[in-house]
Regions:
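Residues on the lipid-exposed face of transmembrane beta-strands in outer-membrane beta-barrel proteins
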Residues: 33-37, 61-67, 73, 134-138, ...
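Extracellular/periplasm-exposed beta-strand and loop segments of Gram-negative cell-envelope proteins
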Residues: 46-52, 99-131, 166-198, 230-250
Length: 262
């Protein structure tokens, strides 16, 4: 499911309005971009298998915004010093990731020549996911001290939620799915090319580096757990195939640039 353009415009307008409203309280703002590789953990491949983890990877890009509670935009001065103001930021995000998927692991090793192995090798998939959400970031070290020290580091952890639009595709190089030629019994009627929406939990750990007075570099490693097993377009019956009972999730290594708005 592609996110409707009208919906994107509405979100952007609401986002701008909320930022303007929050600015009345003196919060300052930061904006940035992120990009990096995504490893998608799905029903394609073998669990806990390095080839699967390395093979089912894609890319992600995003726009991010922060509310900085330690600094006031209306007076270019620090806010009253409280623990929350000096150790927390609120991050908003609009991001997109895409991953091509296929089966890896022992069941598709070259020495396996059965029909089942050939069918697995022929299965292909992909998923594109657009995310909108927020995370609360906690900095154990002082945000004020970091902001005033070029070359400083600011490690953080975060937790939040996102609403996602996913658009999967599943097919086989052997022909149409759900036929004895192309599809293992396990995956009969277990695929879809129909998109949908899903909520997810996002957690990350990372650090910032103070590049200049008004800019930071950032790296973070995050995990996103979806409350659905259809994000990849593949979902064999979990009551029968317990190895596929887990919902879809991904790991994203972000590299970012952040600019402080005055």
């Amino acid at each position: 499911m592609q996110m409707p353009k009208k919906f994107i415009i509405t979100i952007v307008l609401l986002f701008a309005f909320s930022n303007n409203a929050l600015a009345q309280f003196g919060f300052s703002h930061e904006v940035g971009v992120i990009v990096g590789p995504v490893a998608f953990q799905s029903d394609y491949g073998e669990r806990y298998n390095f080839a699967t983890n390395a093979g089912n990877t894609g890319y992600g890009i995003g726009l991010i915004h922060y509310l900085n509670f330690s600094y006031r935009a209306d007076c270019n001065c620090y806010t009253p010093e409280t623990y929350f103001n000096d150790h927390f930021k609120l991050r908003s995000e609009l991001s997109y990731n895409k991953t091509d998927l296929q089966h890896f692991g022992r069941w598709v090793d070259p020495d396996r020549t059965s029909l089942f192995a050939n069918q697995l090798r022929g299965m292909r998939g992909s998923t594109s996911v657009t995310n909108i959400g927020m995370q609360l970031e906690y900095f154990p070290l002082s945000i004020r001290d970091f902001s005033s020290t070029i070359g400083a580091w600011a490690p953080f952890i975060s937790l939040g939620g996102q609403f996602s639009f996913y658009d999967p595709e599943a097919y086989s190089t052997l022909g149409p799915l759900n036929t004895p030629v192309s599809t293992p019994i396990k995956y009969y009627n277990a695929t879809t090319n129909q998109g949908g929406t899903v909520w997810s939990i996002v957690g990350s750990v990372g650090t910032r580096y103070k590049l200049t007075e008004l800019s930071d570099l950032m790296v973070d490693l995050r995990m996103q757990y979806y409350f659905s097993n259809w994000v990849d377009g593949l979902n064999p019956d979990p009551a029968v195939y317990v190895e596929n009972r887990a919902n879809d999730w991904n790991v994203w290594l972000n590299f970012g640039y952040i600019y402080y708005l005055q």
